[in-house]
Curated annotation (Swiss-Prot):
It comes from the Bacteria. Keywords: Cell cycle, Cell division, Cytoplasm, Septation. GO terms for cellular component: cell division site; cytoplasm. This is Cell division protein ZapD. Interacts with FtsZ. Cell division factor that enhances FtsZ-ring assembly. Directly interacts with FtsZ and promotes bundling of FtsZ protofilaments, with a reduction in FtsZ GTPase activity. NCBIfam families: PRK05287.1-4. InterPro entries: ZapD, ZapD_C, ZapD_sf. The gene is zapD. The keyword Cell cycle applies. It is found in: Cytoplasm. GO terms for biological process: division septum assembly; FtsZ-dependent cytokinesis. Belongs to the ZapD family. The lineage of its organism: Bacteria, Pseudomonadati, Pseudomonadota, Betaproteobacteria, Burkholderiales.
Amino acid sequence: MILYEYPFNERIRTLLRLEDLFERFTFFVAQEDAREHHVALTTLFEISEVAGRADLKSDLMKELERQRQTLAPFRGNPGIEQNALEAVLGEIEQTLANLAQMQGKTGQHLIDNEWLASIRSRAVIPGGTCKFDLPSYYAWQQWPAEQRRQDIAKWSMPLLPLRDAAMIVLRLARESGQASKVMAMQGSYQQMLSGRTYQLMQVRVPPELRVIPEASANKYMLWVRFTAQDGDVRPRAVDIDVPFQLTLCNL
């Protein structure tokens, strides 16, 4: 099944963007080639931009504290797996402590590093990081892969508490949902929400159908419409019945 996720608010949208960027960063920083480390570094700049939203850190701390207060009363409950509960609570408490230790504006260490700032300003220009534009950056790219990797890890470290917090919130949101099998008649599906608030919608479709879900929602109803993309033309609506799995997640 192919999984598509649709955020219902700006906070979850931001966390999904951070998750995607950190996954890309983790992949490329683990590689050996200097060009792959260039992608890792420019991705780190993107992470800094997204994570630099003024209220993101405080939002994450409030949400983690809310989850901690929700889960803590289950300690000692015989119907709850205590080892799993303690692991989650320990993870939340450690991440809260790490967030509290973050000082200043998120990503400021990248801005204050004049060398990285020069790379960042050139990286937004098409072809702007050629060796004649940034000879010092080109020289760094000739260093051993492990040395480059250590540098990038050092620059990313101040952002890791935000990554950890985002991953916890997204994981708890995803685990809150229950998948149901539904059918989009002639490619279209709608469902009443009865005013209940959700943070995230997941749509899983069989890959062999080669359809693409498009979704929208308000506090009363959600819509899922399936399209197909063929060659160079824009996706078009399909008129076949599409079986899929729908999950609504609510923290």
